[in-house]
């Protein structure tokens, strides 16, 4: 269950970035391709994929993620009374679930992680629109025969 919300304390922010230039149009239709990170205590936590069976979580300076993403907005998710060490413990625990080789564009992406971390810290979920495109694509993926779809993640080596 999420930590108790407080009106005072350390703010938790959800930082949202555009992944594509077409987001400026898609956003107004309730869609878009976004990267998200969670900022707390001057650190931004996010999730990305790699080919190893270890945590895919990484920490950056706030508003300075890797890659060519463009900052869109920050949403204050609430304030917490947790210590930096307690936050680190929560992030480390999530790192056991969010392994780099488990990244999947539709079902286990940076937005899923950000939602989970926001909930663990504040008891509030991230806005649904940040991952709406992945959710819609997941439904389409389930409706189409597998041979019609290319794999979204590379197959594991034998």
Predicted regions: what is each one?
Residues 135-139:
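Post-kinase regulatory C-tail/linker adjacent to protein kinase catalytic domains
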Residues 102-122:
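Active-site nucleophilic cysteine motif
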Residues 121-133:
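Short conserved catalytic/interaction loops centered on acidic-Pro-aromatic/His motifs
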Residues 1-108, 140-158:
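Non-catalytic ligand/cofactor/substrate-binding and regulatory segments of enzyme domains
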Residues 35, 92, 115-116, 134:
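Short glycine-/small-residue-rich flexible loop motifs, especially phosphate/cofactor-binding loops
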Residues 111, 128-131, 145:
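Alpha-helical catalytic/interaction cores of small GTPase-regulatory modules
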